[in-house]
């Protein structure tokens, strides 16, 4: 029977099991005040290298909490992956953390209209994966993200999820990110 580890021992154990390799950097996209970056740093035992957010207040707070990161205060679609990697001093991304806006998927939004551009933010993961080497991607979102599908425009011009096509876009996104393998494929 194994022994139980306390939180600090688990974190140290995870950091030893998963660390950055030579030349790898860590990315926190959609970085807010730095909570995800703090967790990443606890596991890896080193600072996050690249942080991106379009909101100046969020980036200023992140800078205070994580001064060693290269900060980008701009639309994530406008950040050039190759340039960000070059400026960070790395040659690949060992860990990329993605937290695209969840409000346009969450059931907490109720029946209110949704924004296509915000719902499409997760596609930026594919852009980065096609442009720079990434060893491990983490994408955090609400469980309703799995229902991501096409939108229909109603009579008022508002966009709402097509109830007959739930999950279609999520499946396409997963295929694009995994070169078509099922997320449950053991290979």
Task: Provide a role label for each language-model segment.
Residues 1-187:
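Conserved active-site and SAM-binding loop architecture
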């Amino acid at each position: 029977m194994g022994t139980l580890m306390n939180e600090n021992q688990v974190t140290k154990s995870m950091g030893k099991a998963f660390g950055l390799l030579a030349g790898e950097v860590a990315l926190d996209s959609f970085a807010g005040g730095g909570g995800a970056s703090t967790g990443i740093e606890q596991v890896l035992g080193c600072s996050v290298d690249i942080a991106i957010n379009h909101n100046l207040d969020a980036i200023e707070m992140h800078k205070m909490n994580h001064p060693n990161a290269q900060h980008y205060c701009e639309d994530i679609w406008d950040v050039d992956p190759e340039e960000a990697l070059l400026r960070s001093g790395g040659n690949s991304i060992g860990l990329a953390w993605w937290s695209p806006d969840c409000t346009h998927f969450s059931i907490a939004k109720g029946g209110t209209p949704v924004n296509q551009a915000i719902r499409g933010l997760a596609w930026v993961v594919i852009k980065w994966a096609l442009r720079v080497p990434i060893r491990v991607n983490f994408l955090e979102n609400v469980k309703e993200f799995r229902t991501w599908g096409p939108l229909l425009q109603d009579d008022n011009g508002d966009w709402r999820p097509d109830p007959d096509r739930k999950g279609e876009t999520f499946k396409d996104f997963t295929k694009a990110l995994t070169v078509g393998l099922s997320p449950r494929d053991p290979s």
